[in-house]
Amino acid sequence: MDAGKAGQTLKTHCSAQRPDVCRWLSPFILSCCVYFCLWIPEDQLSWFAALVKCLPVLCLAGFLWVMSPSGGYTQLLQGALVCSAVGDACLIWPAAFVPGMAAFATAHLLYVWAFGFSPLQPGLLLLIILAPGPYLSLVLQHLEPDMVLPVAAYGLILMAMLWRGLAQGGSAGWGALLFTLSDGVLAWDTFAQPLPHAHLVIMTTYYAAQLLITLSALRSPVPKTD
């Protein structure tokens, strides 16, 4: 897999010359609108709430199936989106927090695999360790002992995804950055101290991150045909 070519994005995703991109993104946009308009309270635990939360990410997986050239990069992104949807559903129920975190960790590993390791950019890795690393250490201080290891492991995987996304650049880099921001706010709000409007910030940056990473698969503007 050539990660450099795989990560090239269209300069104008929704230009007049590419109306299919906008058309096939409309289910994602509409499902996001439904989510934010319904704004189901977090204490209302139901499969309906899980479906409403998962639907935008599943729409992005469908978008890739229609619009993106077939290949390993696209398939890895689709797998990551499906794992993310599983994580979204699990996080509706507090008791399923660890399985949800495991699902998102799997999604990040698939993103790392998709982004590849060329160019390596070890200096960027050092910067990421020196920047989000202390924040992760601070969050870990607020955890119960049995949560330290899984959260630390997840944080390291997330930083690896950020490293490879930024190394690839383009919309993948911006998506990786927003995903890290979303998870950072979620971690602080969940484990350290409740933040005002945290849920709105978390979900807005999360959906934007998944969209940007998805768009990195558009190496070719031509929809797949049978």
Swiss-Prot record:
Record-annotated membrane-spanning stretches: 24-40, 47-67, 76-93, 101-117, 124-140, 147-163, 172-188, 200-218
Q: Which ranges of this chain reside in the Cytoplasmic compartment per its record?
A: 1-23, 68-75, 118-123, 164-171, 219-226
Q: Which Pfam families does the entry link to?
A: YhhN (PF07947)
Give the signal peptide as a residue range, or say none if absent: none
- Enzyme class comes to hydrolase
Provide the catalytic activity annotation.
a 1-O-(1Z-alkenyl)-sn-glycero-3-phosphocholine + H2O = a 2,3-saturated aldehyde + sn-glycerol 3-phosphocholine; a 1-O-(1Z-alkenyl)-sn-glycero-3-phosphoethanolamine + H2O = a 2,3-saturated aldehyde + sn-glycero-3-phosphoethanolamine
The membrane topology term of the UniProt record is: Multi-pass membrane protein
Q: Name one GO biological process term.
A: ether lipid metabolic process
The enzyme's E.C. designation: 3.3.2.2
GO CC annotations, alphabetized = cytoplasm; endoplasmic reticulum membrane; membrane
* Domain of life from the UniProt record: Eukaryota
Keyword set, alphabetical order:
Cytoplasm, Endoplasmic reticulum, Hydrolase, Lipid metabolism, Membrane, Transmembrane, Transmembrane helix
Q: How is its activity regulated?
A: Competitively inhibited by lysophosphatidic acid.
Location in the cell reads: Endoplasmic reticulum membrane; Cytoplasm
Q: Which GO terms describe its molecular function?
A: alkenylglycerophosphocholine hydrolase activity; D-lysine 5,6-aminomutase activity; ether hydrolase activity; identical protein binding
**Keyword Phosphoprotein assigned:** no
Q: How does activity depend on pH?
A: Optimum pH is 6.95 and 7.05 with lysoplasmenyl-ethanolamine and lysoplasmenyl-choline as substrates, respectively.
Outline which residue ranges sit on the Extracellular face.
Answer: 41-46, 94-100, 141-146, 189-199
Q: What does this protein do?
A: Catalyzes the hydrolysis of the vinyl ether bond of choline or ethanolamine lysoplasmalogens, forming fatty aldehyde and glycerophosphocholine or glycerophosphoethanolamine, respectively and is specific for the sn-2-deacylated (lyso) form of plasmalogen.
The entry sums up its family as follows: Belongs to the TMEM86 family.
Please describe the quaternary structure of this protein.
Homodimer.
Q: What is this protein's name?
A: Lysoplasmalogenase TMEM86B
The record lists the organism as Homo sapiens
